[in-house]
């Protein structure tokens, strides 16, 4: 009887050890599945607040971003509602409307924002980074398989406060550091439009 009990205990321990060793593989598969789902998410909106800190200035803005496939519209307003800028990409054309209502066009959204505001905002990477995707950059995962951080060229992105939204697990806090700037994006609301 004692031998049978020992064999049963040993079998249970081996079974548990086997489950523990397969966990990282299952996590990796789940990350790949979630990554594929997020890559297919191309129509969404968000609203929140952004703090912008450089050596020369500190600022904050309300953020409204609408993504429609490859096209987007980014509105930044002051905390009291004053228009700062509206940046849009439509059919490959980038237009920025400044705080006086003047339109500016360029092929480089980041350079255009910097020229008019002095802010380095990595617009090219934001549609992916905002959703918790690393693009082609180096990245690290949290234990729960959400994106922890991304290093993309001169930018380091650190993620936090993931929440479930319409079947997706989306970040609500991003801290982006690079090009002499630190941006902190607090997302208050996600809307999945398709």
UniProtKB/Swiss-Prot annotation:
Coiled coil: none annotated. A lipid is attached at residue 19 (S-diacylglycerol cysteine). The keyword Lipoprotein applies. The keyword Transport applies. GO terms for cellular component: cell outer membrane. It is found in: Cell outer membrane. Keywords: Cell outer membrane, Chaperone, Lipoprotein, Membrane, Palmitate, Protein transport, Signal, Transport. NCBIfam families: lolB. This is Outer-membrane lipoprotein LolB. It comes from Aeromonas hydrophila subsp. hydrophila (strain ATCC 7966 / DSM 30187 / BCRC 13018 / CCUG 14551 / JCM 1027 / KCTC 2358 / NCIMB 9240 / NCTC 8049).
């Amino acid at each position: 009887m004692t031998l049978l009990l020992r064999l049963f205990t040993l079998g249970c321990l081996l079974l548990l050890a086997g489950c523990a060793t397969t966990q990282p593989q299952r996590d990796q598969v789940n990350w790949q599945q979630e990554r594929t789902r997020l890559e297919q998410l191309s129509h969404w909106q968000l609203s929140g607040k952004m703090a912008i800190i450089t050596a020369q200035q500190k600022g904050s803005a309300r953020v409204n971003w609408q993504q429609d496939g490859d096209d987007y519209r980014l509105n930044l307003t002051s905390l009291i509602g004053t228009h700062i800028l509206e940046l849009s990409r439509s059919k490959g054309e980038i237009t920025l409307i400044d705080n006086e209502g003047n339109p500016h066009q360029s092929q480089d959204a980041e350079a255009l924002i910097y020229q008019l505001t002095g802010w380095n905002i990595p617009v090219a990477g934001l549609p992916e980074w905002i959703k918790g995707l690393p693009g082609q950059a180096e990245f690290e995962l949290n234990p729960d398989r959400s994106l922890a951080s991304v290093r993309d060229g001169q930018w380091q992105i650190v993620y936090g406060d993931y929440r479930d939204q319409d079947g997706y697990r989306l970040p609500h806090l991003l801290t982006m550091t690079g090009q002499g700037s630190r941006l902190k994006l607090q997302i208050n609301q996600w809307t999945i439009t398709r």
